[in-house]
């Protein structure tokens, strides 16, 4: 089956069409802007899968309807997912703009004095606003000379931010969310909303009963040689934690081996269901070999599966990580408890950064006073105002241990193409696999346990659906916190100590939901959240309006908020603008 091509970025150089001197004097400068933009994007960006980003430049500068149509014809067969229009001069607004209603688009108007690039930018954006096709504005802060071919830092930042978000939009379009199972324990996010996926993300939902996973395991619809490789890998790399179950619920060596085997098989089969696997065609399972074209998935697990079969913790943790028995590779996106809305936040984070995502319960707010009462320890530093305990039953990406290192030696999580095998091994070495607690998981399983290193910048996100309003996005930038070991042990043992932990301190603003740490916890819209490495809230804020999803809560500096220019016409308060504009334009793929 032919592999689906990755979306490309199109660069549209537009020009003043007046011949006999005007156009001729601008051709080289205009095309050089397009080439410089393409060079920047191809050098600085990659797809989440690690592949190089490709840019397609119009064959000619665009002065009017005919050349705009020729450009569009070229792009239509190149799988263009977003467009950037560039110009140093005046051009004819409605005659030259990109009119595709679902493709993210930006316009860079050169800030120079010789020709009025800013005038075209304003004129073209006015057309976009009037026609209901929002576009992003890019205009350098400082005037440049006409022969200056450099891209200023502020322009570069907007080009890259727009492109990252636009590629995320284009990469999700046409893919599917694999809903493996149904509603888990009444969790709202696992009431999978097909209209949300179709209308806002351009995706389909593939609903599959968990009996399909059982069938694939029981009928050996998998690569048996790969299973042996996975078992060998686990035997080499897995460290096992204590079994906290009562004696009557503890499994012997043979039973534990069977649980491990099935857990690894679950990972293999869920991956095959998402992506397909040509090896299955070799055993006459052609239909199953195709997969479901899923860019994200969720596994219900509890309780209809976990009351009798091993839980999904091991499978989900491995799939969400950047490595397995096949080595370092792109992490998948698999949501615990089929929480599709948290899965979408994971998907957004992965597409924006290329990194693995940490799925977690937003479990407990610990005030400084409560911690001092319980442990005798006084919080300081990043944790001085209190912390939030992020913990889930062992399905978080193992990258979340932060045993990878950046160029300065700091703990981090990296895109898979930057991760060494030694760093993958370090993440595995930092993880223990603890037998699942019988009271929760009667079918057994193994939960991963690690502790995230402190001082690492993270962005916590969540998508919620509000009846009458639609989807909204929450964003909280902050840091992981490292507590003294004895303090961590006391706090951790008050909950389930067999699960992975991140102590999180959000950055406070003193206002609204970020007045204090308690307010962050109190305003979080659901029981789950996602950690994405870095302070990348601004990228989420740029992605959200492309899909027409308003941001209901964030602590990103106002100077970093970058949305389509038409948002400014929806009032003077930038967050109210966001709600009114998203309501006005409606979901990107209106249904």
From Swiss-Prot:
GO terms for cellular component: cytoplasm. Its EC number is 5.3.1.25. Mn(2+) binds at residues 337, 361, 528. Gene3D superfamilies: 3.40.50.1070, L-fucose Isomerase, Chain A, domain 2, L-fucose/L-arabinose isomerase, C-terminal. GO terms for molecular function: arabinose isomerase activity; L-fucose isomerase activity; manganese ion binding. Its main location: cytoplasm. Pfam families: Fucose_iso_C, Fucose_iso_N1, Fucose_iso_N2. InterPro entries: Fuc/Ara_isomerase_C, Fuc_iso_dom3_sf, Fuc_isomerase_C, Fucose_iso_dom1_sf, Fucose_iso_N1, Fucose_isomerase, Fucose_isomerase_dom2_sf, Fucose_isomerase_N/cen_sf. The keyword Isomerase applies. Keywords: Carbohydrate metabolism, Cytoplasm, Fucose metabolism, Isomerase, Manganese, Metal-binding. GO terms for biological process: D-arabinose catabolic process; L-fucose catabolic process. Converts the aldose L-fucose into the corresponding ketose L-fuculose. NCBIfam families: fucI, PRK10991.1. PANTHER family: L-FUCOSE ISOMERASE (PTHR37840:SF1). Homohexamer. This is L-fucose isomerase. It comes from Shigella dysenteriae serotype 1 (strain Sd197).
């Amino acid at each position: 089956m032919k592999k689906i091509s990755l979306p490309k970025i199109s660069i549209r150089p537009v020009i003043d069409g007046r011949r006999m001197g005007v156009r001729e004097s601008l051709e080289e400068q205009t095309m050089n802007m397009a080439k410089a933009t393409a060079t920047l994007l191809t050098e600085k960006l990659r797809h989440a899968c690690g592949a190089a980003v490709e840019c397609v430049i119009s064959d000619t500068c665009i002065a009017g309807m005919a050349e705009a149509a020729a450009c569009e014809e070229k792009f239509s067969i190149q799988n263009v997912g977003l467009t950037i229009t560039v110009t140093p001069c005046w051009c004819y607004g409605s005659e030259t703009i990109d009119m595709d209603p679902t493709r993210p688009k930006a316009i860079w108007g050169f800030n120079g004095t010789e020709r009025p690039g800013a005038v075209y930018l304003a004129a073209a954006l006015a057309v976009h606003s009037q026609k209901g096709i929002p576009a992003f504005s890019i205009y350098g802060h400082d005037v440049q000379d006409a022969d200056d071919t450099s891209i200023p830092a502020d322009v570069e930042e907007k080009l890259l931010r727009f492109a990252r978000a636009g590629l995320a939009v284009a990469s999700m379009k046409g893919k599917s969310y694999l809903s493996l199972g149904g509603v888990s324990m009444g969790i709202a996010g696992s009431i999978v909303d097909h209209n949300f996926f179709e209308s806002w993300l351009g995706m389909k939902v593939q609903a599959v009963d968990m009996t399909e996973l059982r069938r694939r395991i029981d009928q050996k619809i998998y690569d048996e040689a790969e299973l042996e490789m996975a078992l060998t890998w686990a035997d080499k790399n897995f460290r096992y934690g204590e079994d906290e179950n009562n004696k009557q619920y503890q499994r012997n060596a043979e039973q534990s081996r069977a649980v491990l085997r099935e857990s690894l098989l679950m990972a293999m089969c869920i991956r095959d269901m998402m992506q397909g696997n040509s090896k299955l065609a070799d055993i006459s399972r052609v239909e199953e070999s195709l997969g479901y074209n899923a860019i994200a998935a969720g596994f219900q697990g509890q309780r209809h599966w976990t009351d009798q079969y091993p839980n999904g913790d091991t499978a989900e943790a491995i799939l969400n990580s950047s490595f397995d028995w096949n080595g370092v590779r792109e992490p998948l996106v698999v949501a615990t408890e089929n929480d599709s809305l948290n899965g979408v936040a994971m998907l957004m984070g992965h597409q924006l950064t290329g990194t693995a995502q940490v799925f977690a319960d937003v479990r407990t707010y610990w005030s400084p006073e409560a911690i001092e009462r319980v442990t005798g320890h006084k919080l300081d530093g990043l944790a001085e105002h209190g912390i939030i305990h992020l913990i889930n039953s062992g399905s978080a990406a193992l990258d979340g241990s932060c045993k990878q290192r950046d160029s300065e030696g700091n703990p981090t999580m990296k895109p898979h193409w930057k991760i060494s095998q030694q760093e993958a091994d370090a993440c595995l070495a930092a993880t223990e696999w603890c037998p699942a607690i019988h009271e929760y998981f009667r079918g057994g399983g193994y939960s991963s346990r690690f502790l995230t290193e402190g001082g690492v910048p993270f962005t916590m996100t969540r998508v919620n659906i509000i009846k009458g309003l639609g989807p909204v996005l929450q964003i909280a930038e902050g840091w992981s916190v490292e507590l003294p070991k004895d303090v961590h042990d006391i706090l951790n043992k008050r909950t389930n100590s067999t699960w992975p932990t991140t102590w999180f301190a959000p950055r406070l603003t003193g206002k609204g939901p970020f007045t204090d740490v308690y307010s962050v916890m109190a305003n979080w819209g659901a029981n789950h959240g996602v950690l994405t490495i870095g302070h990348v809230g601004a990228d989420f804020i740029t992605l959200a309006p492309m899909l027409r999803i308003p941001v209901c809560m964030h602590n990103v500096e106002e100077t970093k908020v970058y949305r389509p220019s038409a948002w400014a016409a929806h009032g003077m308060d930038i967050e109210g603008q966001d709600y009114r504009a998203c309501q006005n334009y409606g979901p990107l793929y209106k249904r």
